[in-house]
Amino acid sequence: MSEAFFVLLKVHLYFPESGSLKAKRSELNAVKAHLRQRMGASVAEVAHQDSWQRSTLAVALAGRSASSCLQAADAVRRMLDARFPQGVRVDGRLASWDDLDAVG
């Protein structure tokens, strides 16, 4: 049985009220800080850096069990749904260290 699990989330955000890159980055930096500081996630903006109304984030969470990782991912989804009522899409994958070993 694996001793390490992780969840990778691809988060698609929409900022309809943002009128500039500066406004988007201000809101996005607050979201990234919350994910890092309150939820212990690793976060990177991976697409749409030059778009003022869209952003795509990669979010990674690690834990000792699959259930703890899934609970953490669920908490991230709930936080994002509350913060972005106009719409957010989150795609996720759960894997274990053993899964990585099997890939090579």
Task: Please report, for each region that a protein language model flagged, where it lies by residue.
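A structural signal for short, well-ordered beta-strand segments
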Residues: 9-13, 57-59, 90-94
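Generic, well-ordered alpha-helical segments
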Residues: 23, 27, 51-53, 61, ...
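Non-catalytic surface loops within mature trypsin-like serine protease
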Residues: 15-17, 63, 96
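N-terminal first-folded block
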Residues: 2-42, 79
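Short, charge-patterned binding micro-sites
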Residues: 44-64, 98
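C-terminal structural segments of small proteins and small subunits
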Residues: 65-104
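A general secondary-structure signal for short beta-strands and their flanking turns/coil
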Residues: 4-8, 52-54, 87
